[in-house]
């Protein structure tokens, strides 16, 4: 594994929080906070890929790199694949990290941890999860559960992803965190595949990879980062960032 590239997909079309990437958090757009966290991970170059010139301008204003992609991509993974072809047509980067643009408080350490399973050449895609500690999350469909076979105390081989409460019986349940590190060839194969049966049923894109026989391993981390999807989430993110600046 060498020379990872972090790509941050961002689009303005969110229905619950319009213009989400540009939402102000302590004086800077949210996408800039995510970009700064990605830089702090120290993995390699960081590029924002977006369908909005205003997002490109916001990132470039702080010295970051951003590329403009088509507005009609069906998923963030497709946006990543287009951006990768623009940024690195020669194929210098063999690992691509997909960091969502709505995680302004994410710990850079877990971004770096996400690539570690790719040291095993049998792994196609790496991701993150955390043990569920709140009872209400066990049955909440918006909390995606990772069902996996333990490899070490902090690493699982993913067998399934579901919105249901799974697996049955005694033992931990894992909250999947939607940050992915792809081998380049795995990303290129993934976006070439049609949506799968289970992907359409669960509305979980990562099932396409599992159904195609690709291997996904997950690193177990301590906490689930705050994702900003609603005005309430945005207020929480502002409070977290304001508290950090006071310390």
From Swiss-Prot:
Gene3D superfamilies: Spore Coat Polysaccharide Biosynthesis Protein SpsA, Chain A (3.90.550.10). It catalyses: 3-deoxy-alpha-D-manno-oct-2-ulosonate + CTP = CMP-3-deoxy-beta-D-manno-octulosonate + diphosphate. It is an enzyme of class 2 (transferase). InterPro entries: Cytidylyl_trans, KdsB, Nucleotide-diphossugar_trans. It is found in: Cytoplasm. The keyword Nucleotidyltransferase applies. The keyword Transferase applies. GO terms for molecular function: 3-deoxy-manno-octulosonate cytidylyltransferase activity. Pathway: Nucleotide-sugar biosynthesis; CMP-3-deoxy-D-manno-octulosonate biosynthesis; CMP-3-deoxy-D-manno-octulosonate from 3-deoxy-D-manno-octulosonate and CTP: step 1/1; Bacterial outer membrane biogenesis; lipopolysaccharide biosynthesis. Activates KDO (a required 8-carbon sugar) for incorporation into bacterial lipopolysaccharide in Gram-negative bacteria. This is 3-deoxy-manno-octulosonate cytidylyltransferase. It comes from Methylobacterium nodulans (strain LMG 21967 / CNCM I-2342 / ORS 2060). The gene is kdsB.
């Amino acid at each position: 594994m060498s020379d990872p590239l972090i790509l941050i997909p961002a689009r303005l079309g969110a229905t619950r929080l319009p213009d989400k990437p540009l939402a102000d958090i302590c004086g800077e757009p949210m996408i800039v906070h995510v970009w700064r966290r990605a830089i702090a991970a120290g993995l390699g170059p960081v590029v924002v890929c977006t369908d909005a010139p205003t997002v490109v301008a916001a990132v470039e204003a702080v010295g970051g790199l951003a590329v403009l992609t088509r507005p009609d991509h069906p998923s963030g993974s497709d946006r990543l694949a287009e951006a990768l072809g623009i940024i690195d047509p020669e194929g210098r980067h063999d690992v691509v990290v997909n960091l969502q643009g709505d995680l302004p408080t994410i710990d850079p350490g877990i971004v770096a941890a996400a690539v570690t399973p790719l040291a095993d050449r049998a792994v196609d895609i790496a991701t993150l999860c955390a043990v569920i500690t709140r009872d209400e999350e066990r049955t909440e469909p918006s909390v995606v559960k990772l069902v996996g076979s333990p490899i070490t105390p902090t690493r699982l081989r993913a067998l399934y992803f579901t919105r249901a409460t799974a697996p049955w019986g005694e033992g931990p349940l894992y909250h999947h965190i939607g940050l992915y590190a792809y081998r380049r060839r795995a990303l290129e194969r993934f976006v070439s595949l049609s949506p799968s049966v289970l992907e359409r049923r669960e509305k979980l894109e990562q099932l396409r990879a599992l159904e195609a026989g690709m291997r996904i391993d997950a690193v177990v981390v301590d906490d689930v980062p705050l994702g900003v999807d609603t005005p309430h989430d945005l207020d929480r993110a502002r409070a977290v960032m304001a508290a950090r600046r006071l310390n």
